[in-house]
């Protein structure tokens, strides 16, 4: 798994996934450090977010060559590569990040898509690629769902009468924070509450 620092929620999900795979008896590692430094032989390397492999804000053109070399090194030892395509490109990708995406997309033995649009768009650019669609899961039945809205608000210490706006995703920069805060402030609702646990860096 190529994820390293996508936030506590993502770390938790990654850990749950790795633990579940381990319980089946499969040895699994979740580490970009091992990708760059290990000489071990792996059956499969699964990329999730190419920008996490090279560093989210990386602007070192040399990393592109090193990424190609590492993939070639592992492939020479029989490793297969899987890439789960979460998005086309990050919103603020520079040229180095774009090249990392190109390399991982073109070098992966299988590309997993979370929907048809991604598959069709990708096959248009990579007609000889091997692809699979695994629909993005929904969180239904993941949590206790027999709790009332009133009881949930009481448990979370949220005002019963407030109109609650949630933003659980990661905020990558100040522009995204300003956009959410601006939209929230301009919302014509007297009793409103913004619930955005990852609004500020390191939160």
Label every PLM stretch briefly.
Residues 1-12:
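Single conserved hydrophobic/aromatic residue that forms the stacking wall/gate
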Residues 26, 37-64, 82-84:
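Short N-terminal targeting/anchoring amphipathic segment
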Residues 65-80, 89, 93-111:
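Membrane-proximal helix-turn-helix segments that form the acceptor-binding/catalytic region
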Residues 143-158:
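A short helix/loop element that forms part of the nucleotide-sugar donor recognition site in Leloir-type
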Residues 158-175:
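Conserved donor-binding/catalytic core segment of Leloir-type glycosyltransferases
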Residues 165, 177-183, 193:
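A structural motif in glycosyltransferase catalytic domains
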Residues 192-203:
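Glycosyltransferase donor-sugar binding loop
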């Amino acid at each position: 798994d190529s994820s390293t620092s996508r936030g506590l929620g993502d770390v938790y999900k990654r850990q749950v996934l790795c633990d579940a795979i381990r319980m089946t008896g499969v040895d699994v590692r979740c580490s970009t450090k091992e990708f760059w430094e290990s000489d071990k032989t792996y059956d499969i390397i699964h990329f999730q977010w190419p920008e996490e492999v090279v560093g989210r804000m990386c602007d070192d053109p040399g990393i592109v060559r090193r990424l190609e070399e590492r993939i070639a090194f592992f492939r020479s030892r029989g490793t297969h590569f899987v890439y789960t395509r979460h998005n086309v490109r990050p919103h603020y990708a520079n040229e180095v990040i774009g090249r990392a995406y190109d390399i991982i997309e073109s070098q992966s033995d299988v590309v997993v898509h979370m929907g048809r649009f991604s598959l069709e768009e990708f096959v248009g650019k990579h007609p000889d690629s091997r692809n699979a669609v695994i629909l993005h899961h929904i969180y239904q039945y993941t949590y206790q769902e027999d709790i009332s809205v009133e009881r949930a608000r009481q448990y979370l210490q949220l005002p019963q009468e407030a109109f609650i706006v949630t933003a659980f995703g990661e905020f990558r920069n100040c522009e995204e924070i300003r956009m959410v805060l601006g939209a929230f402030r301009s919302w014509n609702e007297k009793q409103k509450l913004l619930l955005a646990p990852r609004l500020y860096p390191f939160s």
